[in-house]
Amino acid sequence: MIDWTLNKRLAMLLVAGLPGAVLAAQAQEAAAPDALIDDLDQRLKVIERKLELQQEAAATAAASTAVTRAGTDRFSLASADGKTTIRFRAVLNADYRNYANDLAPNGRALAPGSDGFLLRQVRPYIEGTFGGLVDYRIMPDFAGGKTVLQDAYIVARFKPAFALTAGKFKSPIGLERLQGDTDTRFIERALPDKLIPNRDIGVQLGGDLLNGRLSYQIAYLNGSADGGSSDGNTSPDADNNDDKDYALRLFALPFRDSQWFALRGLGLGIGGSTTDQNGQVDGTGAATQSLLTTYRTNGQQTFFSYRGDTTPTIAWGRRQRLSPQAYYYYGPFGFLTEYVDVRQDVRRVIGATSREATLNHRAWQAQLSWFATGEDEGYRAPAPKRPYVAGGSGWGSLELVARYAVLDIDNAAFDGGTASFTNPVGSASKATALTLGVNWALTQNFKTLLNYEHTKFTGGAAGGADAPAEKVFLARFQFQY
């Protein structure tokens, strides 16, 4: 028989112990996921840290890796943050000159030069920025079978309104002179450029004010002769004397970003300089440095020079330059004009006689330009809208240009007969030049310029006659990068 009493007791024990067993099993099952979560969390933290280390290593490598860029206008190296750069650039101008009147009539001076090819500019150069603050440029020129350092300067750009330049750079006076060599619309600059300095050594403070509507430059320079550079001094790129040039230029774009769109391309300015310059002679009376210069046509023929030999004319006192200037660009049309006034104190000693005077030379020019292919004119030459591409339909840009320029020498330079400051036979009192040209820019890098220039002279030949006009055809094949 079954012992129901015993079975009842066993059943009660099973019932009493079952919940505890179930709870224990549940506790074990709950503990397993918690441990798994902790383990996964640790693994995730390790992976995250490894990714952080990899990102830090990649950032460090990127910061020390130079970025190379190559485009249609330059090749450059830059730091990853772009604050330090070096750009490799070049300008090559290969010219041809052909004179229509190769032989001057008998008794006439100023015979034209020889027809031929020449390398007018060969300028590989570097420029860039260091640390996002200081810009620099170093530009030599190997044309003419010699080496000349054209530019060598640094510019600390503290603010748009405050930049400090030091080194050798363009004097801040002439409008066309300050235009880049690949931006000028003619092969050679106009006659007013003969009266203002090219490049000089010194320091300059400049910047832009009123959101770019007004720019200024104030310079303290060694001083260069009319149309000359400091490398043309008796000791190249060294000062000739203790006196310095003080130069100032203001240029305004009064309607820049104006609602009057047609006036946005109007620019008005004035530049000038002042100094004291005294030339020197040796024991024989010959000039060791006259601090004066000769004036040449764009065919590179001398049409005015001061007397030399043992009784030379030399600079002797104040030299002042003043140049009001303006341009206007609207659509495909452009206009540029400038006037230059130079007052120069001179001296000539002949035996016991000394002659001194203040000579006032003046020059002006006006030039017109028009893009037949529709590009927008500007102070800087624009890139062609449809550059030439092999197999494409573009043939670049076509620009027509015309210019009229005058340089008038002070008549006092010819007074005094044999005691005059210049010899009237070989020196003209006035030059007037008309230039017509066409510019074909195949691409942004290649351009061909063709000019015909007709220059007439007042005086310059024996007996007070006018020297023969210079008629010269100039061609330029230009490469820039």
Describe these PLM feature segments.
Residues L77, A90-L92, L119, P124-G128, ...:
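Residues on the lipid-exposed face of transmembrane beta-strands in outer-membrane beta-barrel proteins
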Residues L77-I86, L133, A161, I173, ...:
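Short loop/turn motifs that connect adjacent beta-strands in outer-membrane beta-barrel proteins
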Residues P112-F142, L209, R213-N222, Q325-R343, ...:
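Surface-exposed extracellular loop regions of Gram-negative outer-membrane beta-barrel proteins
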Residues A57-T68, Y96-V122, I126-L164, I173-D181, ...:
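Surface-exposed loop and membrane-interface regions of Gram-negative outer-membrane beta-barrel proteins
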Residues G71, T84, A111-V122, V148-Q150, ...:
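Residues that define the transmembrane beta-barrel architecture of outer-membrane proteins
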Residues A104-L110, K159-F251, F255-W260, Q280-I314:
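Surface-exposed coil loops of outer-membrane beta-barrel proteins
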Residues I2-W4, A25-N93, N101-P105, F251, ...:
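N-terminal periplasmic/intermembrane-space "pro-region" immediately following the signal or transit peptide
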Residues I2-D3, A31, A262, G272, ...:
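Outer-membrane beta-barrel pore domains
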